[in-house]
């Protein structure tokens, strides 16, 4: 008996939820919020670009990258000398 009564109540609640907000509850400034999206995306893009450039500069100037670059250069010269003496 309870299941028979709860199913119509569930159907009514589901219909109310799927109906969405009433026109009085809807955001009247939806067009202005849609117009501001390109500006926000541009601002987000410039912020990400600035942070990325800062991170890359930090990596380039770090001691680790300098040591790694020197190590690879030395290794390359050693291999090059080895080939020159062998062939």
Curated annotation (Swiss-Prot):
UniProt-recorded Gene Ontology molecular function terms: fatty acid binding; phospholipase inhibitor activity
Signal peptide: 1-26
The keyword Secreted appears for this protein: yes
Superkingdom of origin organism: Eukaryota
Matches recorded under Pfam families: ApoC-I
GO biological process, one term: negative regulation of cholesterol transport
Keywords: Lipid transport, Secreted, Signal, Transport, VLDL
GO cellular component, one term: very-low-density lipoprotein particle
Disulfide topology: none
Entry's localization field: Secreted
Family in the record: Belongs to the apolipoprotein C1 family.
Function field: Inhibitor of lipoprotein binding to the low density lipoprotein (LDL) receptor, LDL receptor-related protein, and very low density lipoprotein (VLDL) receptor. Associates with high density lipoproteins (HDL) and the triacylglycerol-rich lipoproteins in the plasma and makes up about 10% of the protein of the VLDL and 2% of that of HDL. Appears to interfere directly with fatty acid uptake and is also the major plasma inhibitor of cholesteryl ester transfer protein (CETP). Binds free fatty acids and reduces their intracellular esterification.
UniProt-recorded name of the protein: Apolipoprotein C-I
């Amino acid at each position: 008996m309870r299941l028979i009564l709860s199913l119509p109540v569930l159907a009514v609640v589901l219909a109310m939820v799927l109906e969405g907000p009433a026109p009085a509850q809807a955001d009247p400034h939806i067009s202005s919020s849609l117009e501001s999206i390109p500006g926000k995306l541009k601002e987000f893009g410039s912020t990400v670009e600035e942070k990325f450039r800062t991170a890359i500069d930090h990596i380039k100037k770090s001691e680790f990258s300098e040591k790694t670059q020197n190590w690879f250069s030395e290794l390359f010269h050693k291999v090059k000398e080895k080939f020159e003496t062998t062939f």
